[in-house]
Amino acid sequence: MSVSIRRWVVRHPVAAFLVMVYVVNIAVALPSNLTRRDLLPFGFAPYDLLGHIVGSAVPAFLVVAAVLGRGGVRDLVRRTLRWRVKVRWYLLALFFVPVASVLAATALVGTAPLEALGDKWPLLFTVVLPYLLLALFSNLAKEIGWTGFLFDRLQNRYAPLKASLIVWVPWALFHLPGFYEETGSAPGALLLLGLFAIPQLCSRVLVAWLYNNTNRSVFLVGLFHAAFNTTTGPFTREFIPATAEDQFLIQIGGIIIAAILIAVITRGRLSYGPVADQREQPGTITRRVRS
């Protein structure tokens, strides 16, 4: 990294992170699109996984290294690997979304989801669990950048709820290439962007609350993200027998309600407060707020 670029990164760490994320994300989305059209081998998964790692985690570590040096990098690594948290947070991260989905589906379509769970429960181990493990690897890489670096830095300056709102905008745009892959058209991608805008905002609020309650554990946030994607993917396909419209409402309903309740109960603070290893970051104003 040249001296001039390093100086710019130090002065504008958030902008530097986002520039790198978007450049890499677009670059990786291209081969992913080509493999879907059988123009590149191996299928799209290797390129998608590479994009999650190189596109979010690597920029975060590069910026942290430039701004905070080795101490900052060690701190981010510790938070990424922080797994010693209370059992209740593991239960919440893993089971909140699937349980809420089953309850919402039961309210909408009757006992069919419960019957599907009783009849096809082996799929929880043969289909759902393998997907969850792969999703944990890829989503942990994303959360290193978006929560471990970006949100963590912004909540020190703006407080957590406002920081969640700020992160939400680039986070939503980050998904545009994926929406384009799914729909194959720009209008379709923009439509999905609009449909998922509010659920994505609410998910960022829940992520912030979970992060602050687990001593800034990026690992637990990645686990929650993986459980969410697993629920909206194979779990819903196998155990939520409903129309596509009902499935969408089921998936987002619990997230929206939970985010609103948490924001109201914590008065927007999302359990933010001082932690033992929190570091002052250059160019930020650190606030101490009681949970």
Predicted regions: what they are:
Residues L165-A189:
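Membrane-helix boundary elements
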Residues Y22-L30, P98-T106, V169-G178, A226-F235:
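Aromatic-anchored segments of alpha-helical transmembrane domains
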Residues Y22, V54, L94-F95, V128, ...:
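Residue-level signature of the transmembrane alpha-helical core
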Residues A141-W168, A208-S217:
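Membrane-interface helix/loop boundary segments of multi-pass membrane proteins
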Residues A16-Y22, A27-A65, R88-F95, A116-Y131, ...:
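Alpha-helical transmembrane segments in multi-pass membrane proteins
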Residues S2-V19, G43-H52, G71-L103, E115-V128, ...:
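Interfacial transmembrane-helix boundary/kink motif in multi-pass membrane proteins
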Residues T214-S291:
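C-terminal membrane module of polytopic membrane proteins
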Residues R37-G43, L108-D119, Y180-G188, R237-A244:
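Membrane-interface helix termini and inter-helical loops of multi-pass transporters
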